[in-house]
Curated annotation (Swiss-Prot):
The gene is M. Plays critical roles in virus replication, from virus entry and uncoating to assembly and budding of the virus particle. M1 binding to ribonucleocapsids (RNPs) in nucleus seems to inhibit viral transcription. Interaction of viral NEP with M1-RNP is thought to promote nuclear export of the complex, which is targeted to the virion assembly site at the apical plasma membrane in polarized epithelial cells. Interactions with NA and HA may bring M1, a non-raft-associated protein, into lipid rafts. Forms a continuous shell on the inner side of the lipid bilayer in virion, where it binds the RNP. Belongs to the influenza viruses Matrix protein M1 family. SUPFAM superfamilies: Influenza virus matrix protein M1. It holds the Pfam family Flu_M1_C. GO terms for biological process: viral budding from plasma membrane. It comes from Influenza A virus (strain A/Malaysia:Malaya/302/1954 H1N1). This is Matrix protein 1. Transmembrane segments: none annotated. Its main location: virion. GO terms for cellular component: host cell nucleus; membrane; virion membrane. Keywords: Host nucleus, Membrane, RNA-binding, Viral matrix protein, Virion. Residues 1-164 are annotated as: Membrane-binding. The lineage of its organism: Viruses, Riboviria, Orthornavirae, Negarnaviricota, Polyploviricotina.
Length: 252
């Protein structure tokens, strides 16, 4: 796996699923391929994206700044600086300085990542802030190692939280989760279907599902009534794709 592929993988792991994630993935691919060279426009685009947490925006801004060539005097962006200040906690800043001194002696991506993984996400973000604000300089490889370690720490806590929700025995939470998944799957189906004649059927199924979920929420239904909703929808989607000559087995 190449270095940039690894960086893209880690960064995307902390971005919530949805159309925005696909957009960010495309931007990262363009940046890493050298196709997008307007850093200012890229940062303005990132700043106005909804849904993303300030820290995720800060990390993406840091990656874009590392990768896109820019004039020396280009102003640093406040939204990135604020996100990478370790919540203003002096302990984070102290640890960040110690980490920075270690990273300065390191030259490889994997070496930097190994060192960084023993620090908290707050200290890692503060260390990125030091480098972003030009208070410290490390090689691009080392900076990417720091980025990936930070993303791994964040993704780990997201995964633990997600696992707790998926394994919960509370029927009301499970019911709501199934309805949310069915609704987002329906939305994705509508986007994928496009405007061809064959798409009308898929659109109809997706629309009916969304209406059903709205009705279930409006009138309040038994927690078991949502069982299988998402899987029924995915079976319809796969049948539609088969007719269109597309084989996608990875949805379930």
């Amino acid at each position: 796996m190449s270095l940039l592929t690894e960086v893209e993988t880690y960064v995307l792991s902390i971005v919530p699923s949805g159309p925005l994630k696909a957009e960010i993935a495309q931007r990262l691919e363009d940046v890493f391929a050298g196709k997008n060279t307007d850093l200012e426009a890229l940062m303005e685009w990132l700043k106005t994206r909804p849904i993303l947490s300030p820290l995720t925006k800060g990390i993406l801004g840091f990656v874009f700044t590392l990768t896109v060539p820019s004039e020396r005097g280009l102003q640093r962006r406040r939204f990135v600086q604020n996100a990478l200040n370790g919540n203003g906690d002096p302990n984070n800043m102290d640890r960040a300085v110690k980490l920075y001194r270690k990273l300065k002696r390191e030259i490889t991506f994997h070496g930097a990542k190994e060192i960084a993984l023993s620090y908290s996400a707050g200290a890692l973000a503060s260390c990125m802030g030091l480098i972003y604000n030009r208070m410290g300089a490390v090689t691009t490889e080392v900076a990417f190692g720091l980025v990936c370690a930070t993303c791994e720490q964040i993704a780990d806590s997201q995964h633990r939280s997600h696992r707790q929700m998926v394994t919960t025995t509370n029927p009301l939470i499970r019911h709501e989760n199934r309805m949310v998944l069915a609704s987002t799957t329906a939305k994705a189906m509508e986007q994928m279907a496009g405007s061809s004649e064959q798409a009308a059927e898929a659109m109809e199924v997706a629309s009916q599902t969304r209406q059903m979920v709205q009705a279930m929420r409006a009138i309040g239904t038994h927690p078991s009534s949502s069982a299988g909703l998402k899987n029924d929808l995915l079976e319809n989607l796969q049948a539609y794709q088969k007719r269109m000559g597309v084989q996608m087995q990875r949805f379930k």
